[in-house]
A protein has these predicted regions:
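N-terminal secretory signal peptides and thylakoid transit peptides that target proteins
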Residues: 1-18
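Beta1-alpha1 glycine-rich phosphate/pyrophosphate-binding loop at the start
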Residues: 31-103, 188-230, 429
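A Rossmann-like FAD-binding core segment of flavoenzymes
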Residues: 102-112, 119, 127, 206-301, ...
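Glycine-rich dinucleotide-binding loop and its adjacent helix/turn
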Residues: 136-211
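FAD-site-proximal beta/loop scaffold in flavoenzymes
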Residues: 150-178, 275-339, 350
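Internal hydrophobic alpha-helix adjacent to the cofactor/substrate pocket in enzyme cavities
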Residues: 337-361
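C-terminal auxiliary extensions adjacent to catalytic cores
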Residues: 379-429
Length: 429
């Protein structure tokens, strides 16, 4: 991560008026005397920016706009479906950030005017900013699937956001009779957490083996290849041979879902295959969060950014990070969002203090739980070369790995999640 600015230097650069202001509980209307940073989205990325910007720039007014008082992360959600973690383990609030002087508005951003540098809220209020961070996560491209809309997702939950969708899928699985079929449909294209559909199949199978052993999982994949492919395929045979039935496209989108009947719990693939399940979870193709699209920050489905700072290339004084950002070759993941957020916090602090920026150092690691003590991982470090984000080095679990190494990976996974939540939501340091 880039070097942090010295607090004394930053305060001096802001001037006496900013230095004299207090940190806590400042109403939005009274914070005009010092720079204001507004963060749209209070998930892992947005919360991390607030936490690290507060450390680097204690005299800046920081406001998070997030409608949920408590955020349930998508990271770790498969462990909940597998019965290894509770939904409370995945749910976090903003108490610690508030205690550090970060203002959190329980509201939704409905429009961004990048020329006037303001954000309009659902409540009707308009918030001005000097710097804006957009971290709204993902939205879904539902138009590609006939019959699939928000109402259909209540019957066929994608559970690709935390919270209600996640608990809905869990409840459907628990209510299913032993012997029922769970259908999981994985999308093509860029989407949140590339290995997650396959970990999800493993974790649901882990639950079913204990509680509904006559049931099965039908995993349909629109892609001809995917992350950790050999590792997951081995796990399907080793741990869930008679439970997970995997259907993989031979060509792109061959088995993409093109039509659903949510009430009948049926889906149809592009190849003409018609399938029916007791529980059906269709994960649609994805795009940047709706507010980023409405603000004109996208090029196609995602938001182009300067890889050195994650500054939007579409609007001045705006940064986009996390799932909505076009940050290849980094995956869209909680780890990546946390890493990118620290780069954004440093870049904003440097801009406001008129101080030099440092080359970013980014990392991402992804663990996947195959069974209770069997976890695999992959990851990489990233930097900027010739104006592009590039992978500097990488690692991945080997196909043949000692049992003790896999058990150690499991411990790492659980420890990482706890530590990252503390790091993101200001519970430590």
């Amino acid at each position: 991560m880039a070097t942090k600015l010295d607090r004394r230097t930053f305060t001096k650069a802001l001037g006496a008026a900013g230095a004299a202001a207090g940190l806590g509980g400042i109403p939005v209307a009274l914070a005009q005397a010092r720079p204001r940073v507004v963060i749209v989205g209070g998930g892992i990325g947005g919360a991390t920016v607030a936490n690290y910007l507060r450390k680097a720039a204690p005299k800046v007014d920081i406001t998070i706009i997030e409608p949920q008082a408590r955020v349930t992360t998508c990271a770790g959600s498969n462990l909940y479906l597998g019965g290894i973690r509770t939904v409370e383990d995945l749910t976090h609030d903003f108490t610690h950030l508030r205690n550090r002087g970060v203002q959190v508005l329980g509201d939704s951003a409905t429009a961004i005017d990048t020329s006037r540098k303001s954000v309009k809220l659902a409540s009707g209020e308009t918030i001005a900013y000097d710097k804006l961070v957009v971290a709204p996560g993902i939205d879904f491209k539902t138009g590609a699937i006939a019959g699939y809309d928000e109402a259909a997702s209540e019957l066929m939950p994608h559970a690709w956001r935390g919270g209600r969708q996640l608990t809905l899928l869990k409840r459907q699985i628990e209510d299913m009779e032993d012997g029922g079929t769970v259908i999981l449909a994985a999308p093509s294209g860029h989407y949140r957490c590339p290995p997650a559909p396959y970990e999800r199949a493993c974790m649901i199978a882990h639950h079913l083996k204990r509680h509904k052993p006559r049931s099965k999982i039908l995993l349909i994949d629109a892609k001809p290849q995917f992350a950790k492919e050999a590792l997951f395929k081995a796990a399907f045979v080793t741990h869930y041979k008679d439970m997970i039935e995997f259907h993989q496209s031979k060509t792109a989108d061959e088995l993409a879902v093109v039509k659903v009947d949510a009430k009948a719990r049926t889906l149809t693939t592009r190849s003409g295959q018609a399938l029916k399940g007791a529980v059906v979870s269709v994960v649609p193709q994805q795009k940047a969060g709706a507010i980023a699209v409405a603000a004109g920050l996208v090029d196609g489905d995602w938001c182009p950014v300067d890889p050195a700072t994650f500054a939007s290339t579409r609007a001045k004084d705006v940064h986009v990070l996390g799932d909505s950002a076009m940050a290849d070759p980094m995956p869209k993941s909680g780890f990546a969002a946390n890493s990118q957020a620290k780069v954004v916090a440093d870049a904003i602090a440097a801009d406001l203090a008129k101080a030099p920026k440092y080359p970013p150092r980014l990392r991402s690691t992804c663990w996947s739980l195959l069974a209770r003590a069997d976890t695999v991982k992959m990851g990489a470090a990233y930097g900027v070369k010739d104006g592009r984000l590039v992978e500097l080095n990488s690692f991945a679990s080997p196909l043949q790995e000692p049992v003790m190494a896999r058990a150690k990976n499991t411990s790492e996974y659980l420890t990482w999640y706890a530590n990252m939540m503390s790091d993101s939501f200001g519970k430590s340091g």
